[in-house]
Protein backbone atom coordinates (compact mmCIF):
# COMPACT_ATOMS: atom_id res chain seq x y z
CA UNK A 1 0.00 0.00 0.00
CA UNK A 2 2.88 2.33 0.84
CA UNK A 3 4.44 1.94 -2.61
CA UNK A 4 1.09 2.70 -4.22
CA UNK A 5 0.83 5.91 -2.20
CA UNK A 6 4.34 6.92 -3.18
CA UNK A 7 3.57 6.32 -6.86
CA UNK A 8 0.36 8.31 -6.51
CA UNK A 9 2.34 11.21 -5.02
CA UNK A 10 4.95 10.94 -7.79
CA UNK A 11 2.17 11.03 -10.36
CA UNK A 12 0.28 13.99 -8.88
CA UNK A 13 3.29 16.14 -8.00
CA UNK A 14 3.84 17.50 -11.55
CA UNK A 15 0.29 18.87 -11.56
CA UNK A 16 0.62 20.75 -8.29
CA UNK A 17 1.76 24.38 -8.34
CA UNK A 18 5.41 24.49 -9.28
CA UNK A 19 6.76 25.26 -5.82
CA UNK A 20 9.25 22.42 -6.19
CA UNK A 21 10.87 23.87 -9.33
CA UNK A 22 10.18 25.07 -11.27
CA UNK A 23 4.43 42.39 -33.50
CA UNK A 24 2.02 41.33 -32.84
CA UNK A 25 -1.48 40.41 -32.80
CA UNK A 26 -2.22 37.05 -31.56
CA UNK A 27 -3.22 34.28 -29.55
CA UNK A 28 -3.53 32.36 -26.43
CA UNK A 29 -1.90 29.71 -24.45
CA UNK A 30 0.57 26.91 -25.16
CA UNK A 31 1.76 23.84 -23.51
CA UNK A 32 4.48 24.08 -20.87
CA UNK A 33 6.17 20.92 -22.07
CA UNK A 34 8.14 18.72 -19.75
CA UNK A 35 9.65 21.55 -17.70
CA UNK A 36 7.85 23.68 -15.12
CA UNK A 37 9.06 27.28 -14.78
CA UNK A 38 11.01 28.14 -11.63
CA UNK A 39 9.57 30.33 -8.92
CA UNK A 40 11.18 33.71 -9.45
CA UNK A 41 11.78 36.02 -6.56
CA UNK A 42 9.88 39.25 -7.21
CA UNK A 43 12.89 41.31 -6.22
CA UNK A 44 14.80 43.01 -9.02
CA UNK A 45 17.86 41.39 -10.50
CA UNK A 46 17.59 37.66 -9.87
CA UNK A 47 19.98 35.70 -12.07
CA UNK A 48 18.98 32.79 -14.29
CA UNK A 49 20.61 30.51 -16.84
CA UNK A 50 19.00 29.51 -20.15
CA UNK A 51 18.23 25.80 -20.55
CA UNK A 52 17.32 25.94 -24.25
CA UNK A 53 17.81 28.16 -27.28
CA UNK A 54 15.06 30.71 -27.93
CA UNK A 55 14.60 32.88 -31.00
CA UNK A 56 12.55 36.05 -30.54
CA UNK A 57 9.05 35.88 -32.00
CA UNK A 58 8.27 39.58 -31.67
CA UNK A 59 10.22 42.82 -31.41
CA UNK A 60 9.64 42.78 -27.64
CA UNK A 61 11.13 39.29 -27.14
CA UNK A 62 14.74 38.53 -26.24
CA UNK A 63 16.72 35.87 -28.12
CA UNK A 64 19.18 33.70 -26.20
CA UNK A 65 21.10 30.42 -26.33
CA UNK A 66 21.31 27.53 -23.89
CA UNK A 67 23.83 28.39 -21.18
CA UNK A 68 23.41 32.16 -21.48
CA UNK A 69 23.10 34.15 -18.24
CA UNK A 70 20.07 36.39 -17.81
CA UNK A 71 18.94 38.87 -15.19
CA UNK A 72 15.18 38.72 -14.62
CA UNK A 73 13.70 42.17 -14.06
CA UNK A 74 9.94 41.56 -13.95
CA UNK A 75 7.85 38.41 -13.41
CA UNK A 76 4.38 39.97 -13.43
CA UNK A 77 3.34 38.41 -16.77
CA UNK A 78 2.37 34.77 -16.32
CA UNK A 79 4.68 32.56 -18.35
CA UNK A 80 6.73 35.49 -19.69
CA UNK A 81 9.38 37.42 -17.80
CA UNK A 82 11.20 40.62 -18.64
CA UNK A 83 14.93 39.90 -18.65
CA UNK A 84 18.27 41.47 -19.53
CA UNK A 85 21.02 39.56 -21.29
CA UNK A 86 24.28 39.62 -19.33
CA UNK A 87 26.54 38.72 -22.26
CA UNK A 88 26.48 41.72 -24.57
CA UNK A 89 28.23 40.01 -27.45
CA UNK A 90 26.34 36.72 -27.51
CA UNK A 91 26.30 35.17 -31.01
CA UNK A 92 23.26 36.03 -33.09
CA UNK A 93 21.80 38.36 -30.47
CA UNK A 94 22.32 41.59 -32.38
CA UNK A 95 21.69 44.73 -30.33
CA UNK A 96 18.64 43.44 -28.44
CA UNK A 97 19.78 43.13 -24.81
CA UNK A 98 16.45 43.29 -22.98
CA UNK A 99 13.06 41.73 -23.64
CA UNK A 100 10.53 39.08 -22.70
CA UNK A 101 11.49 35.42 -22.32
CA UNK A 102 9.41 32.25 -21.78
CA UNK A 103 9.78 31.43 -18.09
CA UNK A 104 9.93 27.66 -18.65
CA UNK A 105 13.14 28.05 -20.68
CA UNK A 106 15.27 29.17 -17.73
CA UNK A 107 16.34 28.06 -14.26
CA UNK A 108 17.83 29.97 -11.37
CA UNK A 109 21.58 30.22 -11.75
CA UNK A 110 23.58 27.66 -9.74
CA UNK A 111 20.43 25.73 -8.87
CA UNK A 112 19.99 22.00 -9.39
CA UNK A 113 17.50 22.72 -12.19
CA UNK A 114 20.18 24.66 -14.08
CA UNK A 115 22.48 21.64 -14.38
CA UNK A 116 22.49 20.11 -17.89
CA UNK A 117 22.33 16.59 -16.42
CA UNK A 118 19.29 17.22 -14.18
CA UNK A 119 15.96 16.24 -15.78
CA UNK A 120 13.60 16.74 -12.85
CA UNK A 121 10.55 14.57 -12.26
CA UNK A 122 10.58 12.52 -15.46
CA UNK A 123 9.62 8.87 -15.33
CA UNK A 124 11.96 5.92 -15.75
CA UNK A 125 10.50 5.05 -19.17
CA UNK A 126 10.95 8.62 -20.39
CA UNK A 127 14.54 8.66 -19.15
CA UNK A 128 15.23 5.52 -21.16
CA UNK A 129 13.60 6.94 -24.27
CA UNK A 130 15.62 10.16 -24.10
CA UNK A 131 18.93 8.39 -23.45
CA UNK A 132 18.31 6.04 -26.38
CA UNK A 133 18.11 8.89 -28.90
CA UNK A 134 20.78 8.31 -31.53
CA UNK A 135 22.50 11.58 -30.64
CA UNK A 136 23.61 10.12 -27.28
CA UNK A 137 26.63 7.83 -26.89
CA UNK A 138 27.73 5.30 -24.26
CA UNK A 139 28.28 7.11 -20.97
CA UNK A 140 25.47 9.60 -21.56
CA UNK A 141 23.59 10.10 -18.30
CA UNK A 142 20.94 12.04 -16.45
CA UNK A 143 19.78 12.43 -12.88
CA UNK A 144 16.06 12.52 -12.14
CA UNK A 145 13.81 12.67 -9.12
CA UNK A 146 12.90 9.22 -7.84
CA UNK A 147 9.38 8.05 -8.71
CA UNK A 148 9.00 5.87 -5.62
CA UNK A 149 11.07 7.61 -2.95
CA UNK A 150 10.20 11.27 -2.47
CA UNK A 151 13.31 13.39 -1.97
CA UNK A 152 15.63 10.78 -3.47
CA UNK A 153 17.20 10.73 -6.91
CA UNK A 154 17.97 8.17 -9.59
CA UNK A 155 20.90 8.01 -12.00
CA UNK A 156 20.20 6.68 -15.51
CA UNK A 157 23.18 5.76 -17.69
CA UNK A 158 23.50 4.59 -21.31
CA UNK A 159 25.80 1.58 -21.69
CA UNK A 160 26.19 0.10 -25.18
CA UNK A 161 22.58 0.68 -26.17
CA UNK A 162 21.12 -0.35 -22.79
CA UNK A 163 19.94 2.09 -20.10
CA UNK A 164 20.80 1.16 -16.52
CA UNK A 165 19.40 2.80 -13.42
CA UNK A 166 20.90 3.39 -9.96
CA UNK A 167 19.35 4.70 -6.77
CA UNK A 168 21.17 7.69 -5.36
CA UNK A 169 20.60 7.41 -1.63
CA UNK A 170 20.65 10.15 1.00
CA UNK A 171 22.69 10.18 4.18
CA UNK A 172 20.82 11.01 7.38
CA UNK A 173 23.26 13.84 8.05
CA UNK A 174 22.98 15.11 4.47
CA UNK A 175 24.80 14.11 1.34
CA UNK A 176 24.47 11.35 -1.25
CA UNK A 177 25.93 7.94 -2.08
CA UNK A 178 25.63 4.89 -4.31
CA UNK A 179 27.70 2.79 -1.90
CA UNK A 180 28.52 3.92 1.62
CA UNK A 181 32.26 3.58 1.04
CA UNK A 182 32.08 6.76 -1.08
CA UNK A 183 29.81 9.65 -0.11
CA UNK A 184 29.31 13.16 -1.48
CA UNK A 185 28.07 16.43 -0.03
CA UNK A 186 26.28 17.48 -3.22
CA UNK A 187 25.05 15.98 -6.47
CA UNK A 188 27.62 18.12 -8.28
CA UNK A 189 30.40 16.38 -6.36
CA UNK A 190 28.75 13.05 -7.16
CA UNK A 191 28.73 13.81 -10.91
CA UNK A 192 32.27 15.19 -10.90
CA UNK A 193 33.58 12.03 -9.24
CA UNK A 194 31.87 9.54 -11.56
CA UNK A 195 33.00 11.43 -14.64
CA UNK A 196 36.56 10.51 -13.66
CA UNK A 197 35.96 6.86 -12.71
CA UNK A 198 33.22 4.24 -13.02
CA UNK A 199 33.92 2.89 -9.49
CA UNK A 200 30.85 0.64 -9.28
CA UNK A 201 28.90 1.99 -12.24
CA UNK A 202 28.57 0.03 -15.47
CA UNK A 203 30.53 2.78 -17.24
CA UNK A 204 32.19 6.11 -16.46
CA UNK A 205 29.85 9.07 -16.89
CA UNK A 206 30.55 11.06 -20.04
CA UNK A 207 28.29 13.78 -21.48
CA UNK A 208 24.86 14.63 -20.05
CA UNK A 209 21.89 13.33 -22.02
CA UNK A 210 20.90 15.84 -24.69
CA UNK A 211 17.74 17.78 -23.89
CA UNK A 212 16.08 17.24 -27.24
CA UNK A 213 12.51 17.67 -26.03
CA UNK A 214 12.25 21.45 -25.90
CA UNK A 215 9.26 22.77 -23.91
CA UNK A 216 6.68 24.93 -25.62
CA UNK A 217 6.19 28.51 -24.38
CA UNK A 218 2.92 29.17 -22.58
CA UNK A 219 1.68 31.55 -25.28
CA UNK A 220 2.74 32.89 -28.64
CA UNK A 221 4.10 35.98 -26.89
CA UNK A 222 3.68 37.88 -23.64
CA UNK A 223 1.18 40.22 -25.32
CA UNK A 224 -1.15 37.34 -26.18
CA UNK A 225 -1.50 35.98 -22.64
CA UNK A 226 -4.88 37.64 -22.17
CA UNK A 227 -5.87 37.87 -25.83
CA UNK A 228 -8.03 35.28 -27.46
CA UNK A 229 -9.33 36.64 -30.74
CA UNK A 230 -6.49 37.59 -33.09
CA UNK A 231 -6.24 39.34 -36.43
CA UNK A 232 -6.29 36.67 -39.16
CA UNK A 233 -3.85 38.80 -41.14
CA UNK A 234 -1.18 37.76 -38.62
CA UNK A 235 -1.57 34.17 -39.89
CA UNK A 236 -0.11 32.89 -43.15
CA UNK A 237 -1.39 29.58 -44.52
CA UNK A 238 1.61 27.78 -46.02
CA UNK A 239 0.77 24.14 -46.71
CA UNK A 240 -2.42 22.12 -46.51
CA UNK A 241 -1.88 19.10 -44.26
CA UNK A 242 -5.28 17.46 -44.56
CA UNK A 243 -9.03 17.88 -44.77
CA UNK A 244 -12.14 16.37 -43.24
CA UNK A 245 -15.83 16.88 -42.74
CA UNK A 246 -15.25 19.99 -40.60
CA UNK A 247 -12.73 21.74 -42.83
CA UNK A 248 -9.01 21.76 -43.50
CA UNK A 249 -5.79 21.71 -41.48
CA UNK A 250 -2.87 23.87 -42.60
CA UNK A 251 0.69 24.44 -41.59
CA UNK A 252 0.88 28.15 -40.94
CA UNK A 253 3.11 30.93 -39.71
CA UNK A 254 2.22 33.49 -37.07
CA UNK A 255 3.80 36.95 -37.12
CA UNK A 256 6.29 35.76 -39.78
CA UNK A 257 8.17 33.94 -37.00
CA UNK A 258 6.32 31.06 -35.40
CA UNK A 259 5.12 27.80 -37.03
CA UNK A 260 1.56 26.91 -36.05
CA UNK A 261 -1.25 24.59 -37.11
CA UNK A 262 -4.43 26.23 -38.39
CA UNK A 263 -7.82 24.54 -38.65
CA UNK A 264 -10.02 26.36 -41.15
CA UNK A 265 -13.62 25.36 -40.48
CA UNK A 266 -16.40 25.07 -43.01
CA UNK A 267 -19.08 27.76 -42.60
CA UNK A 268 -21.79 26.52 -40.25
CA UNK A 269 -19.69 23.72 -38.75
CA UNK A 270 -19.78 25.37 -35.32
CA UNK A 271 -21.40 28.27 -33.53
CA UNK A 272 -18.70 30.84 -32.68
CA UNK A 273 -20.30 31.71 -29.35
CA UNK A 274 -20.51 28.05 -28.31
CA UNK A 275 -16.91 27.51 -29.28
CA UNK A 276 -15.61 30.57 -27.45
CA UNK A 277 -17.35 29.45 -24.26
CA UNK A 278 -15.69 26.06 -24.51
CA UNK A 279 -12.37 27.60 -25.53
CA UNK A 280 -12.20 29.64 -22.33
CA UNK A 281 -11.90 26.33 -20.49
CA UNK A 282 -9.70 24.63 -23.08
CA UNK A 283 -7.08 27.36 -23.03
CA UNK A 284 -6.48 26.88 -19.31
CA UNK A 285 -5.55 23.19 -19.70
CA UNK A 286 -1.76 22.80 -19.81
CA UNK A 287 0.04 19.49 -20.00
CA UNK A 288 2.95 18.10 -22.08
CA UNK A 289 0.67 15.50 -23.68
CA UNK A 290 -2.13 17.90 -24.67
CA UNK A 291 -2.19 20.14 -27.74
CA UNK A 292 -2.58 23.63 -26.33
CA UNK A 293 -4.90 26.04 -28.05
CA UNK A 294 -3.13 29.25 -29.13
CA UNK A 295 -5.81 31.51 -30.58
CA UNK A 296 -8.91 31.81 -32.72
CA UNK A 297 -10.25 33.97 -35.53
CA UNK A 298 -14.06 33.91 -35.33
CA UNK A 299 -15.18 37.31 -36.60
CA UNK A 300 -15.68 36.05 -40.15
CA UNK A 301 -15.72 32.77 -42.06
CA UNK A 302 -13.86 30.55 -42.16
CA UNK A 303 -13.24 30.27 -38.44
CA UNK A 304 -9.55 29.67 -37.65
CA UNK A 305 -8.38 27.58 -34.69
CA UNK A 306 -4.65 28.09 -34.13
CA UNK A 307 -2.68 25.47 -32.21
CA UNK A 308 0.80 24.05 -31.79
CA UNK A 309 2.15 22.40 -34.95
CA UNK A 310 2.76 18.63 -34.88
CA UNK A 311 4.57 17.84 -38.11
CA UNK A 312 3.70 14.15 -38.45
CA UNK A 313 -0.07 14.59 -38.52
CA UNK A 314 -2.67 12.38 -36.85
CA UNK A 315 -1.88 9.10 -35.14
CA UNK A 316 -4.44 7.42 -37.38
CA UNK A 317 -2.56 8.40 -40.54
CA UNK A 318 0.79 7.68 -38.91
CA UNK A 319 -0.27 4.12 -38.04
CA UNK A 320 -1.89 3.45 -41.40
CA UNK A 321 1.08 4.74 -43.39
CA UNK A 322 3.53 2.60 -41.41
CA UNK A 323 1.45 -0.56 -41.44
CA UNK A 324 3.82 -2.27 -39.02
CA UNK A 325 6.98 -1.89 -41.10
CA UNK A 326 8.81 0.08 -38.39
CA UNK A 327 6.44 0.46 -35.44
CA UNK A 328 6.76 -2.37 -32.94
CA UNK A 329 4.96 -3.22 -29.70
CA UNK A 330 7.29 -1.14 -27.53
CA UNK A 331 6.41 2.00 -29.49
CA UNK A 332 2.71 1.10 -29.58
CA UNK A 333 2.66 0.79 -25.79
CA UNK A 334 4.53 4.10 -25.52
CA UNK A 335 1.91 5.77 -27.74
CA UNK A 336 -0.84 4.48 -25.47
CA UNK A 337 1.02 5.52 -22.30
CA UNK A 338 1.52 9.08 -23.54
CA UNK A 339 -2.16 9.43 -24.46
CA UNK A 340 -3.14 8.00 -21.07
CA UNK A 341 -0.89 10.59 -19.42
CA UNK A 342 -2.68 13.45 -21.15
CA UNK A 343 -6.07 11.95 -20.39
CA UNK A 344 -5.12 11.43 -16.73
CA UNK A 345 -4.48 15.17 -16.55
CA UNK A 346 -7.93 15.90 -18.04
CA UNK A 347 -9.32 13.43 -15.50
CA UNK A 348 -7.63 15.35 -12.68
CA UNK A 349 -9.21 18.56 -13.98
CA UNK A 350 -12.69 16.99 -14.19
CA UNK A 351 -12.70 17.59 -17.93
CA UNK A 352 -14.18 15.21 -20.52
CA UNK A 353 -12.81 14.79 -24.05
CA UNK A 354 -15.92 13.26 -25.70
CA UNK A 355 -14.16 12.29 -28.93
CA UNK A 356 -10.99 10.38 -28.05
CA UNK A 357 -9.73 8.48 -31.11
CA UNK A 358 -6.53 8.04 -33.12
CA UNK A 359 -7.66 10.80 -35.49
CA UNK A 360 -7.56 13.19 -32.52
CA UNK A 361 -4.05 12.30 -31.36
CA UNK A 362 -1.20 14.12 -33.10
CA UNK A 363 2.37 12.96 -33.70
CA UNK A 364 5.42 15.18 -33.26
CA UNK A 365 9.18 14.81 -33.50
CA UNK A 366 11.02 12.18 -31.44
CA UNK A 367 7.95 9.95 -30.96
CA UNK A 368 5.90 12.51 -29.06
CA UNK A 369 2.12 11.99 -29.03
CA UNK A 370 -0.41 14.56 -27.84
CA UNK A 371 -4.17 14.56 -27.37
CA UNK A 372 -5.99 17.11 -29.53
CA UNK A 373 -9.52 18.47 -30.00
CA UNK A 374 -10.65 17.80 -26.43
CA UNK A 375 -14.04 19.40 -25.83
CA UNK A 376 -14.69 20.27 -29.47
CA UNK A 377 -17.23 17.46 -29.89
CA UNK A 378 -19.70 19.59 -27.95
CA UNK A 379 -19.65 22.41 -30.50
CA UNK A 380 -19.26 20.74 -33.91
CA UNK A 381 -22.33 20.24 -36.08
CA UNK A 382 -22.07 17.07 -38.19
CA UNK A 383 -24.12 14.84 -40.45
CA UNK A 384 -22.77 11.33 -41.02
CA UNK A 385 -24.19 7.81 -40.83
CA UNK A 386 -21.59 6.83 -38.26
CA UNK A 387 -22.58 9.73 -36.03
CA UNK A 388 -25.41 9.20 -33.57
CA UNK A 389 -27.49 12.35 -33.14
CA UNK A 390 -29.43 12.46 -29.92
CA UNK A 391 -32.67 14.28 -29.34
CA UNK A 392 -30.62 16.88 -27.48
CA UNK A 393 -28.54 17.52 -30.60
CA UNK A 394 -25.38 15.90 -29.26
CA UNK A 395 -23.50 14.13 -32.06
CA UNK A 396 -21.61 10.95 -31.32
CA UNK A 397 -19.00 8.94 -33.26
CA UNK A 398 -20.74 5.67 -32.46
CA UNK A 399 -17.81 3.28 -32.93
CA UNK A 400 -15.82 5.10 -30.26
CA UNK A 401 -18.66 5.99 -27.88
CA UNK A 402 -19.55 4.14 -24.67
CA UNK A 403 -22.96 2.42 -24.65
CA UNK A 404 -24.29 4.51 -21.77
CA UNK A 405 -23.36 7.74 -23.58
CA UNK A 406 -25.24 6.55 -26.67
CA UNK A 407 -28.20 5.46 -24.57
CA UNK A 408 -28.53 8.36 -22.11
CA UNK A 409 -26.47 11.23 -23.55
CA UNK A 410 -24.57 11.29 -20.25
CA UNK A 411 -20.82 11.67 -20.69
CA UNK A 412 -18.18 11.12 -18.06
CA UNK A 413 -14.49 10.43 -17.86
CA UNK A 414 -15.51 6.76 -17.81
CA UNK A 415 -17.04 7.10 -21.28
CA UNK A 416 -13.66 8.51 -22.34
CA UNK A 417 -12.06 5.36 -20.88
CA UNK A 418 -14.28 3.26 -23.18
CA UNK A 419 -13.10 5.36 -26.13
CA UNK A 420 -9.50 4.84 -25.00
CA UNK A 421 -10.06 1.10 -25.30
CA UNK A 422 -11.12 1.62 -28.93
CA UNK A 423 -8.02 3.78 -29.42
CA UNK A 424 -5.90 0.88 -28.15
CA UNK A 425 -7.55 -1.29 -30.81
CA UNK A 426 -6.57 1.29 -33.46
CA UNK A 427 -2.99 1.37 -32.18
CA UNK A 428 -2.49 -2.40 -32.11
CA UNK A 429 -4.09 -2.89 -35.58
CA UNK A 430 -2.15 -0.03 -37.22
CA UNK A 431 -5.17 2.20 -37.65
CA UNK A 432 -7.83 -0.26 -38.75
CA UNK A 433 -11.46 0.81 -38.48
CA UNK A 434 -13.12 -0.73 -35.41
CA UNK A 435 -16.23 -2.80 -36.13
CA UNK A 436 -15.20 -2.93 -39.78
CA UNK A 437 -18.14 -3.52 -42.12
CA UNK A 438 -20.76 -2.46 -39.56
CA UNK A 439 -22.88 0.67 -39.75
CA UNK A 440 -23.38 2.87 -36.72
CA UNK A 441 -26.85 1.39 -36.18
CA UNK A 442 -25.46 -2.16 -36.30
CA UNK A 443 -22.80 -1.28 -33.75
CA UNK A 444 -25.43 0.10 -31.38
CA UNK A 445 -27.42 -3.13 -31.72
CA UNK A 446 -24.37 -5.36 -31.16
CA UNK A 447 -23.27 -3.39 -28.10
CA UNK A 448 -26.74 -3.97 -26.71
CA UNK A 449 -26.00 -7.71 -27.03
CA UNK A 450 -22.79 -7.23 -24.99
CA UNK A 451 -20.59 -7.69 -28.08
CA UNK A 452 -16.94 -6.64 -27.82
CA UNK A 453 -14.27 -6.32 -30.48
CA UNK A 454 -12.36 -9.62 -30.71
CA UNK A 455 -8.66 -9.87 -29.89
CA UNK A 456 -6.65 -8.97 -33.02
CA UNK A 457 -4.29 -11.68 -34.24
CA UNK A 458 -1.13 -9.69 -33.42
CA UNK A 459 -2.39 -8.39 -30.07
CA UNK A 460 -0.72 -9.74 -26.89
CA UNK A 461 -3.07 -11.03 -24.21
CA UNK A 462 -1.77 -8.44 -21.73
CA UNK A 463 -2.62 -5.58 -24.11
CA UNK A 464 -6.05 -7.01 -24.93
CA UNK A 465 -6.89 -7.41 -21.24
CA UNK A 466 -6.36 -3.67 -20.78
CA UNK A 467 -8.72 -3.02 -23.69
CA UNK A 468 -11.36 -5.29 -22.14
CA UNK A 469 -11.08 -3.47 -18.80
CA UNK A 470 -11.90 -0.24 -20.63
CA UNK A 471 -15.02 -1.89 -22.10
CA UNK A 472 -16.55 -3.01 -18.82
CA UNK A 473 -20.33 -2.64 -19.10
CA UNK A 474 -20.34 -0.89 -15.71
CA UNK A 475 -18.67 2.53 -16.07
CA UNK A 476 -17.61 2.57 -12.42
CA UNK A 477 -15.72 -0.69 -12.94
CA UNK A 478 -13.56 0.75 -15.71
CA UNK A 479 -10.05 1.80 -14.65
CA UNK A 480 -9.08 5.41 -14.17
CA UNK A 481 -6.72 7.00 -16.67
CA UNK A 482 -4.24 7.32 -13.83
CA UNK A 483 -4.30 3.52 -13.45
CA UNK A 484 -4.14 2.99 -17.21
CA UNK A 485 -1.10 5.25 -17.37
CA UNK A 486 0.70 3.26 -14.68
CA UNK A 487 -0.15 -0.05 -16.31
CA UNK A 488 1.17 1.07 -19.68
CA UNK A 489 4.27 2.71 -18.20
CA UNK A 490 5.08 -0.55 -16.40
CA UNK A 491 3.95 -2.81 -19.26
CA UNK A 492 7.39 -4.33 -19.86
CA UNK A 493 8.75 -3.91 -16.33
CA UNK A 494 6.08 -4.69 -13.74
CA UNK A 495 8.83 -4.93 -11.12
CA UNK A 496 11.13 -1.99 -11.71
CA UNK A 497 14.69 -2.97 -10.93
CA UNK A 498 17.88 -1.00 -10.35
CA UNK A 499 21.42 -2.06 -11.17
CA UNK A 500 23.61 -3.10 -8.25
CA UNK A 501 26.89 -1.21 -8.02
CA UNK A 502 28.51 -4.29 -6.45
CA UNK A 503 28.21 -6.04 -9.82
CA UNK A 504 30.68 -3.60 -11.36
CA UNK A 505 33.26 -3.22 -8.59
CA UNK A 506 36.62 -4.78 -9.45
UniProtKB/Swiss-Prot annotation:
Give residue ranges for domain SH3. 43-111
Q: What is its EC number?
A: 2.7.10.2
Quaternary data: Interacts (via the SH3-domain) with PTEN. Interacts with RB1.
The reaction(s) catalysed by this protein are: L-tyrosyl-[protein] + ATP = O-phospho-L-tyrosyl-[protein] + ADP + H(+)
> At which residues is Phosphotyrosine found?
388
Q: Name one GO molecular function term.
A: protein tyrosine kinase activity
Briefly, what is this protein's role? Non-receptor tyrosine-protein kinase that negatively regulates cell proliferation. Positively regulates PTEN protein stability through phosphorylation of PTEN on 'Tyr-336', which in turn prevents its ubiquitination and degradation, possibly by reducing its binding to NEDD4. May function as a tumor suppressor.
Q: Which UniProt keywords apply?
A: ATP-binding, Cytoplasm, Kinase, Lipoprotein, Nucleotide-binding, Nucleus, Phosphoprotein, SH2 domain, SH3 domain, Transferase, Tumor suppressor, Tyrosine-protein kinase
Q: Which tissues is it found in, per the record?
A: Highly expressed in stomach, small intestine and colon. Concentrated in the brush border membranes of epithelial cells, throughout the maturation axis of the adult small intestine.
Residues the entry annotates as binding ATP: 241-249, 263
Name the UniProt record assigns to this protein: Tyrosine-protein kinase FRK
Q: Which organism is it from?
A: Rattus norvegicus (Rat)
Q: Which SMART domains match?
A: SH2, SH3, TyrKc
State where the protein is found. Answer: Cytoplasm; Nucleus
Q: Where is the Protein kinase domain?
A: 235-492
* GO biological processes: cell differentiation; cell surface receptor protein tyrosine kinase signaling pathway; negative regulation of transcription by RNA polymerase II
The record's annotation in InterPro entries points to: Kinase-like_dom_sf (IPR011009), Non-receptor_tyrosine_kinases (IPR050198), Prot_kinase_dom (IPR000719), Protein_kinase_ATP_BS (IPR017441), Ser-Thr/Tyr_kinase_cat_dom (IPR001245), SH2 (IPR000980), SH2_dom_sf (IPR036860), SH2_Frk (IPR035805)
Q: Where is the SH2 domain?
A: 117-209
* Residues with PTM Phosphothreonine: 179
Q: Which GO terms describe its cellular component?
A: cytoplasm; cytosol; nucleoplasm; plasma membrane
Residues at the catalytic site = 355 (proton acceptor)
Instruction: Tell me the protein family, please.
Output: Belongs to the protein kinase superfamily. Tyr protein kinase family. SRC subfamily.
Q: What is the lineage of its organism?
A: Eukaryota, Metazoa, Chordata, Craniata, Vertebrata
Amino acid sequence: MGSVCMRLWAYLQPFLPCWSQEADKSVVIENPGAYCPPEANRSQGQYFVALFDYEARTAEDLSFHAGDKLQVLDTSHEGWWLARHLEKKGPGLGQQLQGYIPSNYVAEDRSLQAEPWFFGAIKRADAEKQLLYSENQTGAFLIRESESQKGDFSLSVLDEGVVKHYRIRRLDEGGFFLTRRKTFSTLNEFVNYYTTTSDGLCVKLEKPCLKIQVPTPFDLSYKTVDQWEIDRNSIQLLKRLGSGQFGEVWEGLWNNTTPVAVKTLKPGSMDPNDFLREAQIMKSLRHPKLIQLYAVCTLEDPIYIITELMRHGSLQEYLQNDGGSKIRLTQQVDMAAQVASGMAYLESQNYIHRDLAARNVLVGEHNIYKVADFGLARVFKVDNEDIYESKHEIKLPVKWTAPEAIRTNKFSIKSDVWSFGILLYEIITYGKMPYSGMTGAQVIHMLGQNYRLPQPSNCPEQFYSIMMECWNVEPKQRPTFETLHWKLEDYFEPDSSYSDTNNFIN
